[in-house]
C-alpha cells in the first residue's frame, strides 16, 4: 500500500496525486492539516522538515516532494506500473 501525506493547499501534493490517479495507482491520502499525528509523522520521516508531499511505499522507502519523472520511475522500479 502506498500512503501519501499532503494537504489540499499544496501544489506539489496535487501534482503528485494527479499523476498517481492518471497511472491508476491506489493510495491512502492523509491530510496533515486535519491530522496532527500525521503532521508529526511527516516531520519524523523527513528528519525534522515539514516538507510535503511525503509518499511512503510498500518497501518502506519514501520520497519527499518528488518530481513526476522520479515518482513514476520509483513506481516502475517497484513493479506498481509498467514503463
Protein language model features and the residues they cover:
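Structural micro-motif
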Residues: 46-55
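Conserved strand-to-helix beginnings and helix N-cap segments that scaffold or border functional pockets
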Residues: 14-17, 39, 68
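Thiol-based oxidoreductase modules, predominantly thioredoxin-like and allied folds used
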Residues: 25-39
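Short alpha-helical
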Residues: 11, 37, 50, 70
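Non-catalytic, surface beta->alpha helical segment in thiol-disulfide oxidoreductase systems
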Residues: 57-83
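Local sequence-structure signature of Cys/Sec-based thiol-disulfide redox active-site neighborhoods
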Residues: 1-25
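Short amphipathic alpha-helix with an adjacent loop that forms part of the alpha/beta core around
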Residues: 40-46, 75
Amino acid at each position: 500500500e502506498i500512503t501519501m501525506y499532503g494537504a489540499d493547499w499544496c501544489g506539489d501534493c496535487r501534482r503528485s496525486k494527479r499523476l498517481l490517479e492518471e497511472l491508476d495507482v491506489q493510495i491512502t491520502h492523509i491530510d496533515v492539516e486535519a491530522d496532527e499525528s500525521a503532521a508529526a509523522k511527516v516531520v519524523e520521516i523527513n528528519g525534522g522538515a515539514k516538507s510535503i508531499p511525503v509518499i511512503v511505499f510498500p518497501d518502506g522507502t519514501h520520497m519527499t516532494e518528488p518530481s513526476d519523472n522520479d515518482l513514476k520511475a520509483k513506481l516502475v522500479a517497484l513493479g506498481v506500473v509498467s514503463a
